[in-house]
């Protein structure tokens, strides 16, 4: 009797969980797509000398931000740095 109850519950659990396995496979496919886009975004977020040549809209939807900074503490020479940023 206990064995038959066990098998009934076992098969109910399998039947109940089966759609979940299919959902997991669909989620895995959806999760791989943003990874490719994320790799492109990482290559776009680099230091630049200007925002003039924003290759293939790398900064979109972000913006390219530029500023000047001194090369070292004792130097008066400044260099321009640009970077894609969310803010």
Swiss-Prot record:
Q: Name one GO molecular function term.
A: toxin activity
User: Which keywords does this chain's UniProt record carry?
Assistant: Calcium channel impairing toxin, Disulfide bond, Ion channel impairing toxin, Knottin, Neurotoxin, Secreted, Signal, Toxin, Voltage-gated calcium channel impairing toxin
Cite a GO CC annotation.
extracellular region
What tissues contain this protein? Expressed by the venom gland.
Q: Which family does it belong to?
A: Belongs to the neurotoxin omega-lctx family.
Q: What does this protein do?
A: Modulates Cav2.1/CACNA1A voltage-gated calcium channels (P/Q-type currents) in rat cerebellar Purkinje cells and hippocampal CA1-CA3 neurons. At saturating concentrations (>10 nM) decelerates activation kinetics and slightly increases peak amplitude without affecting deactivation kinetics. In vivo, does not cause death when intravenously injected into mice. In rat models, through its activity on Cav2.1/CACNA1A, has an ameliorative effect on memory defects provoked by hyperstimulation of N-methyl-D-aspartate receptors (NMDARs) in the hippocampus.
The protein here is known as: Omega-lycotoxin-Am1b
Specify the species.
Answer: Alopecosa marikovskyi (Wolf spider)
